[in-house]
């Protein structure tokens, strides 16, 4: 009987022991984005004389992180590649790139005019530096007075304007102008002017007087 029992035990199929694969416990870090102090909107304007001015202006997108800014910047045309009559505008969320907006109507702009021959040498660089000043709050505590910036591509020459909210605040406006000029690496002997939107809107000719210069 004992030998028979041994034979029966031997005939019982042995269970296969599955070897567990070793999987290291790797913690996947979430993709961390770096928030900006303000949310910004990028606008595009293309001149179509058959439409009202406002109908030619459209909001491309809004962003509020460093990564989203670069993702946007690297996937749109550079200003130097735009057709004549086109604009880019970047403004704080809630502000539209027009004089009539309540955040702009009492303000003005620091204006840089570039000759046509500088379009492929300086224009893109100056525009990028301007954007970095905006999103990086590059004007210290005076950044709260910044509304946004506009770049105009025109046949006769291009313009970059930095808009502020209060044209009467001399200390704030002049500080921003000096800091902006420094950030762009402009020579000291080069003078740039600040124009109040109210003066630009009521000018009698093509020239608007400068309220401040640096």
Curated annotation (Swiss-Prot):
Keywords annotated in UniProt: Cytoplasm, Nucleus
Major site of localization recorded for this protein: cytoplasm
Entry keyword Transport: no
GO biological process: regulation of translation; translational initiation
Any one GO cellular component localisation term in the record: nucleus
Database matches in SUPFAM superfamilies: eIF4e-like
Expressing tissues: Ovary, muscle and testis.
Sequence positions that bind mRNA: 53-54, 99-100, 154-159, 202-204
Locations listed in the record: Cytoplasm; Nucleus
Protein known as: Eukaryotic translation initiation factor 4E-1B
Naturally occurring in which organism (per UniProt): Danio rerio (Zebrafish)
